[in-house]
Amino acid sequence: TYNDLYLDLRQRLRKAGVEAAQLEARELICHASGKSQEEFLKDSRLYAPSPVEEQLAVDVQRRLAGEPVAYIIGEWNFYGLPLTVTPAVLIPRPDTEIIAARAIELAKAAGPHGRVLDLCTGSGCIGLAVAKHAENCRVVLGDLSEDALRVCRQNARQNGLTARTTILTVDALQLPTHFLGDFNV
């Protein structure tokens, strides 16, 4: 059953020293099965079809080889936003949500014409969280990596935030080649 798969996988991950074995086992099974967490819980007594078990075996080997679960499943949740993640960007961490919360406060305090700069944006997690929760501001997200910018653009699109964001190539160690304007945050 799905529950048996979960219990076995959780145990394997714990033996391998994975701290968040419970969370990661559930995430990997949901990914392999295409189920939400709610569907996984509801269907826990059902038997998983062979293709799900085969995909799970591949995913588990990747995890046991040290690949982060977020890269295996290709997405991670940050401040209520589902974000695509690839090895081209850092995985959003829960402690970074503290920075996002403060940036949101500052952006809201800046008023309806506030401007926010998210430099070295990677996945765009901080800037996109600001754009989502401080709706009257404009956010400029910049990175030097074109691969990271592709991920950031995809995240802006999938979260419906392209109208309030500008995503561009910026080298944090160089003066900008074009005038970016003033920023409140």
For the regions a language model picked out, list residue spans one by one:
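Non-catalytic accessory regions of SAM-dependent methyltransferases
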Residues: 1-41, 45-48
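Amphipathic alpha-helical regulatory segments at dimerization interfaces
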Residues: 11-15, 62, 155
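Histidine kinase transmitter module recognition
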Residues: 16, 32, 88, 158-159, ...
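Conserved SAM/SAH cofactor-binding pocket of Class I
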Residues: 97-185
